[in-house]
C-alpha cells in the first residue's frame, strides 16, 4: 500500500473529519422536519404539502446514488469529497435565498445529488482510514456524527429558524460546511478509488439472497420510521399540544438517544447479531404504536422519544454493518444501493405520512408506522432463520 495514500496505522483524525461531514449532511437532510410549520407559513402551504420536500429529496437521492457512484468511481476520494461539498454549499446558499417553494425544492435537489455521492462512499472510507482492528469503532464514530446531527443539528436548526427565520438556518449550514470542507481537505489522506465496483457488480450482488433481504428490510423499516418522524413537529404541536420549546426538547431527546444506540451497537451487535436487530425493530414498532396513547402526557412522550431514538440508530448501524460485510468486494456499489434504498424508505414514509395526515389525521401517523414496523419484524425473523449462516456475524 502506498504510504502517500493510506497509512498502515490509519488515522482517527481522518475518521473524525468524516464524522464531522456526516454531522453536516444529516443535519441538512432532516432539518426541515423541525421547520415544516415555518416554511409552510412563508409560502402559505399546509405542512402536509411542505413535508413532501422530504419525499422529493429522498427519492432524488435514491435515484442518483448508484448512477453518481458509477460516474465517479475512478475519482480519487478526497478530491471527490471536495467537489461534493462545493455543490452542497452552493445549494444551501440558494436555499437561503429561495423566493418561492419551487426554488427551494430546486436547491434541495442540488443538495440531494451531493448527498447521494457522500453516503455512497463515506462508510467504506471510514473503514479504510481507521486504525487496524478499529473498523467497527470507526463506523460507530461516523454514527456519532449522524447522532449529533439529531442531538444538536436539528434542534439547533429549529431554534435558529424560530429566532431568525428558517432561511438563516440554511445559510448557517452553508457557513459550517465551508469550515468542514477546509478540515476535510487538510486531514484526509489521498484515497484512490478502491473496491468501488461497477455495473458488473450488480448481478453479483443481487445473486446474494441475504443481501437482497437486508435491502428489502431497510425499505420497510425506514418507511415505518418516516411515516411518523417526518411529521413529528406538527404532531407534537397539534396533537400533543406541546409548546415550541417542548417540541424542540422532544427532538433533542430523540437525537440524544441515538448516542446510546451507537454505544449499544458497539458493545452488543457482534455478540448478539440476530437478537440485536430483532430487538431494535421491536423497540421501534413499540415506540410508534405508543406515540398516540402517550401524546396526552408530554413527559411520557419525551421518555418514549428516548426508546425511539435508540432503536432507529441501532437498526441503521446493524444494517450498514451487515451490508459492508456481505459485499466486501464491491463496497461502494453495495453502499450506494443501501443509501438509495434507505432514501426510498424515507421518501415512501414521508409520502405515506402526508397521505395519512390528510386522510386520517396527524394522530394516526404512529399507528400506520407501527403496522409497517410489524411487517419489518416478520421479515427480519424470516431472514434470521433462512439466512442464519450468512447473517451470523456483523464483524467487518
From Swiss-Prot:
Assigned keywords, A-Z: Cell inner membrane, Cell membrane, Membrane, Sugar transport, Transmembrane, Transmembrane helix, Transport
One Pfam entry name: MFS_1
SUPFAM superfamilies: MFS general substrate transporter
Lipid bilayer topology: Multi-pass membrane protein
Residues passing through the membrane, by range: 15-35, 50-70, 81-101, 103-123, 136-156, 170-190, 209-229, 246-266, 276-296, 298-318, 333-353, 365-385
GO biological process, alphabetically ordered: transmembrane transport
Gene3D superfamilies linked to this entry: MFS general substrate transporter like domains
GO molecular function terms attached to this record: carbohydrate transmembrane transporter activity; transmembrane transporter activity
Domain of life: Bacteria
Listed GO CC annotations: plasma membrane
Main location: membrane
Subcellular location: Cell inner membrane
HAMAP family documented for this protein: MFS_SotB
Family: Belongs to the major facilitator superfamily. SotB (TC 2.A.1.2) family.
Record PANTHER family: PURINE EFFLUX PUMP PBUE (PTHR43124), SUGAR EFFLUX TRANSPORTER (PTHR43124:SF4)
Function: Involved in the efflux of sugars. The physiological role may be the reduction of the intracellular concentration of toxic sugars or sugar metabolites.
Name the record gives this protein: Probable sugar efflux transporter
Organism: Pseudomonas aeruginosa (strain ATCC 15692 / DSM 22644 / CIP 104116 / JCM 14847 / LMG 12228 / 1C / PRS 101 / PAO1)
Gene designation: sotB
